[in-house]
C-alpha cells in the first residue's frame, strides 16, 4: 500500500550500486543537496545507512545487513523503519467524516472511534489517486497518512474539495503534521519491544486500532498497522524525540530489532501482496481492478457518493476487464512493465512489481491480466529483456500475514 518507491519508478528489491544511485539523482534532482532529510538522517548515516534519493528525500535503502538478511530478520524478529517522508495529517470538525467520504471509498462513518482502515482516494473516473490508512480518532477527528510521492497531489486534491465543501457551509479544517516524524516497528517482536516503553496495555490493541499514548516520555499517535504483512505499529512521534525513541526501541529489543531500509520494505510488502502506488496502482486503475473491493464499505456500495462511484459500482456488479494477480516466474526476476503472454504468445497484460523473495527463495511478482485469465494455476509466459520465461498465476499473499487480531 504505502510509502511506495514512486520516484524510483520500479521495485528495488535488488541492491542499487553507485551507478544506479547516480542515475536516479541525475534523473530527478540537480544534486544530493536538493533532497530533503528526515530528522533521523544523521542517525541513519551513523548506523551505516546507504542513502538514496526517493520522492524528494534522502532515505536509507539498506544498512550493513543485505536486503535479504533484513527481510528475513523482519519476519523472524523485527525491523524499525524511518517512514517520516510520508505525510500525516488530521481532518477536524463536525463534518470531517462527511467530507472525507466524498473523496474515499471507505465507510468512514461506520468506523468506531479508535479504529481505522486502508482506503483509496479516487478520481472522477474511478481511478486511484492514492491509497491511505485512515483512522477515526473521534467523530470529529480523522488522522490519515498519505504516500510521500503523492503528497503534493493529494494535498492539492484535498484542499480543492475542502474549499468547495466549506463554501457550502461544511465544518472541516485540516492540519499537516510536519512537526512529527513517523517510525514503523514491524515483526513478531514489535509488541513485546514497544510494551517495554509504555504503560498502556498493548495486548488489547488489535490490527487497525489507534491510540494517543505516552511512549518513552513522548505523546505519540500509535496505529497497529504496517506495510510488511507482519504484526507491527506506525508511531507518529514529535520530531524532537524521534531519534531518542528509535534508540530506545533498538535497545529494548536487545539487538533483535534492526534498522531496515526501503529495499527490504519493498520485498516485504511484495511478499505480503500489498500494492505499491505508482506501480500496482495508478490513476487509471480502479480499486476493483486492483483487488481492493473489500476496502469499499457495504454502505458505500449501496449509496455511492464518492468520486468515480458510477464506474466503480458498475465494475463491482459486472466484473472488471482486468485484474491484479500474483505471479510466480522462472528465469530472472520480472520487473515492472514486463509483458505477460498467454500460452499462445498473445499479450494479456503486464507485470507491475517483481523481485526475488528472500523468504520463499523464488521469483514472485504482481501484474494485471485480462479477466478470465486471473485464476490461480493459470499458466502464462513473461517476457524479460526480450526472452520468454514460464510463469503462472498464484494466490496472494505469497507469505502468510501475521496481523495481531482477537483470538
From Swiss-Prot:
The glycine cleavage system is composed of four proteins: P, T, L and H. Substrate binds at residues 234, 265, 403. It is found in: Mitochondrion. Belongs to the GcvT family. One of its GO terms (biological process) is glycine catabolic process. Keywords: Aminotransferase, Mitochondrion, Transferase, Transit peptide. It comes from Flaveria trinervia. The gene is GDCST. GO terms for molecular function: aminomethyltransferase activity; transaminase activity. The keyword DNA-binding does not apply. This is Aminomethyltransferase, mitochondrial. The lineage of its organism: Eukaryota, Viridiplantae, Streptophyta, Embryophyta, Tracheophyta. It comes from the Eukaryota. It catalyses: N(6)-[(R)-S(8)-aminomethyldihydrolipoyl]-L-lysyl-[protein] + (6S)-5,6,7,8-tetrahydrofolate = N(6)-[(R)-dihydrolipoyl]-L-lysyl-[protein] + (6R)-5,10-methylene-5,6,7,8-tetrahydrofolate + NH4(+). Its EC number is 2.1.2.10.
Amino acid at each position: 500500500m504505502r510509502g511506495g518507491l514512486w520516484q524510483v519508478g520500479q521495485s528495488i528489491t535488488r541492491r542499487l550500486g553507485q551507478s544506479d544511485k547516480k542515475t536516479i539523482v541525475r534523473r530527478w534532482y540537480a544534486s544530493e543537496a536538493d533532497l530533503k532529510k528526515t530528522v533521523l538522517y544523521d542517525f541513519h548515516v551513523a548506523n551505516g545507512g546507504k542513502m538514496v534519493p526517493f520522492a524528494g528525500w534522502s532515505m536509507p535503502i539498506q544498512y550493513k545487513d543485505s536486503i535479504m538478511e533484513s527481510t528475513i530478520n523482519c519476519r523472524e524478529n523485527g525491523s524499525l523503519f524511518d517512514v517520516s517522508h510520508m505525510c500525516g495529517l488530521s481532518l477536524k470538525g463536525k463534518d470531517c467524516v462527511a467530507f472525507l467520504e466524498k473523496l474515499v471509498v471507505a465507510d468512514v462513518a461506520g468506523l468506531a472511534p479508535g479504529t481505522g482502515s486502508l482506503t483509496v482516494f479516487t478520481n472522477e473516473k474511478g481511478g486511484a489517486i492514492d491509497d491511505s490508512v485512515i483512522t477515526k480518532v473521534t467523530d470529529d477527528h480523522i488522522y490519515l497518512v498519505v504516500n510521500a510521492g503523492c503528497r503534493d497531489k493529494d494535498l492539492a486534491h484535498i484542499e480543492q474539495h475542502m474549499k468547495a465543501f466549506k463554501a457550502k457551509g461544511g465544518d472541516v479544517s485540516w492540519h499537516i503534521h510536519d512537526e512529527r516524524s513517523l517510525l514503523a516497528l514491524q515483526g513478531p517482536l514489535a509488541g513485546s519491544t514497544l510494551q517495554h516503553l509504555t504503560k498502556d496495555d498493548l495486548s488489547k490493541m488489535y490490527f487497525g486500532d489507534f491510540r494517543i499514548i505516552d511512549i518513552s516520555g513522548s505523546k505519540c499517535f500509535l496505529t497497529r498497522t504496517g506495510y510488511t504483512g507482519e504484526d507491527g505499529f506506525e508511531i507518529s512521534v514529535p520530531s524532537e524525540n524521534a531519534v531518542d525513541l528509535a534508540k530506545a526501541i533498538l535497545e529494548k529489543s536487545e539487538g533483535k530489532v534492526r534498522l531496515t531500509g526501503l529495499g527490504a520494505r519493498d520485498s516485504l510488502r511484495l511478499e505480503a501482496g500489498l500494492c505499491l502506488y505508482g506501480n500496482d496502482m495508478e490513476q487509471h486503475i480502479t480499486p476493483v481492478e486492483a483487488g481492493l473491493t473489500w476496502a469499499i464499505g457495504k454502505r458505500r456500495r449501496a449509496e455511492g457518493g464518492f468520486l468515480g462511484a458510477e464506474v466503480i459500482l458498475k465494475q463491482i456488479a459486472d466484473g472488471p476487464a482486468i485484474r491484479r494477480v500474483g505471479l510466480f516466474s522462472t528465469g530472472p526476476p520480472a520487473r515492472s512493465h514486463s509483458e505477460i503472454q498467454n500460452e499462445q504468445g498473445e499479450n494479456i497484460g503486464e507485470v507491475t512489481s517483481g523481485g526475488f523473495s528472500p523468504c520463499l527463495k523464488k521469483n514472485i511478482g504482481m501484474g494485471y491480466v485480462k479477466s478470465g485469465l486471473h485464476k490461480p494455476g493459470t499458466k502464462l509466459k513473461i517476457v524479460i529483456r526480450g526472452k520468454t520465461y514460464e510463469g503462472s498465476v498464484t494466490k496472494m499473499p505469497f507469505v502468510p500475514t501475521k496481523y495481531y487480531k482477537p483470538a
